[in-house]
Amino acid sequence: MAGTVVLDDVELREAQRDYLDFLDDEEDQGIYQSKVRELISDNQYRLIVNVNDLRRKNEKRANRLLSNAFEELVAFQRALKDFVASIDATYAKQYEEFYIGLEGSFGSKHVSPRTLTSCFLSCVVCVEGIVTKCSLVRPKVVRSVHYCPATKKTIERRYSDLTSLVAFPSSSVYPTKDEENNPLETEYGLSVYKDHQIITIQEMPEKAPAGQLPRSVDVILDDDLVDRVKPGDRVQVVGTYRCLPGKKGGYTSGTFRTVLIACNVKQMSKDVQPSFSAEDIAKIKKFSKTRSKDIFDQLARSLAPSIHGHDYVKKAILCLLLGGVERDLENGSHIRGDINILLIGDPSVAKSQLLRYVLCTAPRAIPTTGRGSSGVGLTAAVTTDQETGERRLEAGAMVLADRGVVCIDEFDKMSDMDRTAIHEVMEQGRVTIAKAGIHARLNARCSVLAAANPVYGRYDQYKTPMENIGLQDSLLSRFDLLFIMLDQMDPEQDREISDHVLRMHRYRAPGEQDGDAMPLGSAVDILATDDPNFSPDDQQDTQIYEKHDNLLHGIKKKKEKMVSAAFMRKYIHVAKIIKPVLTQESAAYIAEEYSRLRSQDSMSSDTARTSPVTARTLETLIRLATAHAKARMSKTVDLQDAEEAVELVQYAYFKKVLEKEKKRKKRSEDESDAEDEVEKSQEDQEQKTKRRRICPSDAKEGDSYDPYDFTNTEEEMPQVHTPKATDSQETKESQKVELSESRLKAFKAALLEVFREAHAQSVGMNRLTESVNRDNEEPFSSAEIQAALSRMQDDNQVMVSEGIVFLI
């Protein structure tokens, strides 16, 4: 037995010597010697080693490292500590252990959670997946020091479990007494702890077999690897696959829980901070100077080139990506700089496609849908921790998208309670939680881009925008811009769209020949942490314009060039940093245009507002003008920026409402027939038309086509063909009749009872007259009813319109 231990020690020392020779490569290329020096200067203790380099120098040792990870990694880490001590002895004493992280090509050991089987136990594997869950970071004791006051001795105890590289786990009993039953005091300052976190990685949905649920695996992160990732990140985790026995009632069952003990974590998703070279900065400066006149239009045209038209919407989305300037005033108030946009329109007008483009372009973007997300899922939820049973906060989509964009599709399918939850986020940029003993405030400074369908499925142009949208004013005022996107029947437009869509379907990626079979399934999987065909030169050389493709971009026009997506991403990232200042001229213009917007809806008869014009609209104009100035890389918000912002708001805030002319003609013919039957004179008819010009619309038309009447007025409609002269006579009589206060009070009580019985906010005039006089000893005449209603209308208690009484 002793010989075996000695043999193991000999093998361990031999492995340690091999790894030390590999690290000490001064005579070769000196790669790892320079890496260790960088590690010391950066005050780090984990060295990332490429398996390909080890395989090139010592293939046998590389194979043993991948297949017998625990013993080999212990030897490798000891060799690293010896090598660090040879370079800087004082630095080596600062840390008890130095760690090795692996990267490179793993071949058959590059797996997904589904293909991670028992044959990979104790091997180094590379697993790809999406992070679905992250536990809290907790301290884990590595070494505890205890002092005995009675004997004045110090006791030290080390702890190791199955998640560490040590072969045999130690006892987890924390000592409180020594061998002679003397009490011990823990010296917390001398004890050593390490950070510990557990994350769950799930198989990528595109790589899961059809019709099967994606599988997941738990990953243990220690020390410097904690908090490297967050839920939703696509990652590659390199680590050792190990099984942990599960004890139940003192017995170990035959099935084991498996975990991955990570030694390196690498993000696969695009970086929040794109890498810039000096060449990129020079290109961005040159582009902003040479195209200073039409740079905003040029960038807006290049947004989502696969979508035809929607020029104003693309300009607004560019403003959303650039954002305004956020301000925190001295009195504690906060002025948001994020721009929120709502797209409402018919099906198949590319609303969801625009959202998908923003997801690909914005540095941080979180997608959600109206039906699949709740209020707490968007803001923050209080959950119970599985390990400790404590209550803790879990961030929602808007908190995760802090300083980014939240894209909400099918916004109209959300319930009113869930929509109310995002009110605070959209204006204040934060989430306040006060429940289950937790009071917290989380930052959620994100822009909201939402898409919704109208109330009736398709947009009804004969109804006002507010009736079509069907959302509360308190929510609509928080959206800076609301666009109504219609699917209109225009032969010329339809021809252009069909030509564009057909070109998109005929487009083939570069390198594919026409007529070649399209590959089934996904592209070829790269079984390495880095793409072997990737060269750093490709990353640095970012082209400003895309190469023209007749299928992708259509027939080439003289001055129309498309900015490439990579350059657009970098340009937006640089432009967002600029904080332009309003000039006196632009501030005066915005103030003047704001007052004009407030009064515009009362002047124009055939247009209606899509959302209320409030004081928030003034801030919207400032934010849009600031975003336009950022696109020009300007330090000031000039008059041209303010004019562009006003043009966007004018387009988004007002929508034309059509009138049903054919039906109006038909109704007027019916009216004339009714008047002939009653044998009205020509003079009375002229007086009637004069009065009709004064009132907004005809009474009969209102009775038959009123959207607000929820009572059974349809049964009464045929009876409302009496000539309108009686109404005019009643109004004349009502002017003569003076109603006493007691009669008015009795009428108000009877009217309230009528509304209560009807369970509605509106009642027809005929039904009102019958109900008021039903059980009344002193019935009201029609003149008294008209006089009482006019008095109540003056006091803003009711509203009478087109023969229907509305309760305010």
UniProtKB/Swiss-Prot annotation:
Comp. bias intervals (Basic and acidic residues) = 679-688, 727-739
Reaction equation(s) it catalyzes: ATP + H2O = ADP + phosphate + H(+)
Residue positions of the PTM Phosphotyrosine?
Answer: 708
Q: Cellular component terms, GO, for this chain's entry? A: CMG complex; MCM complex; nucleus
Binding-site positions, ATP: 523, 664
Alphabetized CDD domains for the sequence: MCM3
Give its E.C. classification number. Answer: 3.6.4.12
In this UniProt entry, the residues modified to N6-acetyllysine are: 293, 547
Domain MCM spans what residues? Answer: 295-502
Q: Which InterPro entries match?
A: AAA+_ATPase, MCM, Mcm3, MCM_CS, MCM_dom, MCM_lid, MCM_N, MCM_OB
Task: Read off the SMART domains from this record.
Answer: AAA, MCM
Q: What is its main location?
A: nucleus
Q: Identify residues that carry Phosphoserine.
A: 160, 275, 535, 611, 668, 672, 681, 728, 734
List residues binding ADP: 353, 393-395, 397
User: Which residue positions does Phosphothreonine occur at?
Assistant: 713, 722
Arginine finger, short sequence motif: residues: 477-480
Biological role: Acts as a component of the MCM2-7 complex (MCM complex) which is the replicative helicase essential for 'once per cell cycle' DNA replication initiation and elongation in eukaryotic cells. Core component of CDC45-MCM-GINS (CMG) helicase, the molecular machine that unwinds template DNA during replication, and around which the replisome is built.
Q: What is this protein called?
A: DNA replication licensing factor MCM3
Task: Specify the species.
Answer: Bos taurus
Upper taxonomic lineage:
Eukaryota, Metazoa, Chordata, Craniata, Vertebrata
Whichever gene encodes this chain, its name is MCM3
